[in-house]
Amino acid sequence: MDKNNKIASRVALGALFAYGNATIAPYSEQFYVGGANSIRAFTVRSIGPGGYHPAESRYSYLDQTGTFRFEANVEYRFRIFKSIWGATFLDAGNVWLMRKDEARPNSQLELKTFPKQIALGTGVGIRYDMDILVFRLDFGIPLHLPYDTERSGYYN
């Protein structure tokens, strides 16, 4: 755009396959989304897989990984003063399982449910750019949850 206004975007896709006699990929290699470098309106590993939503538990994040990942971000950055920048952003994505898992319903990747199972978040942030290092502080809010909340509309 110009030296005081910028647009940054990113798309990340990933697929993970088990090999040898394994039926699933190791947990440490599986994908997860959410957090400061992902979908900023959600905490780390709090989304997915698919439309699955675990019961409230201290350990629920352990189940929220998948073998397929889609993630997209777009961010508008504007200069406030010298090295201080403001930003608005929109993040989207989720993880899914490539195989059916009875213990985690609605977690398998299916084309018909794909759009409904995309988590959306938006927010604002401030950046301090020192040329070799950027400090940032972002605040995000969820716009759409990928699981059923029994509410309608996007801001649920």
Feature locations, PLM:
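C-terminal transmembrane beta-barrel domains of outer membrane proteins
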Residues: 1-156
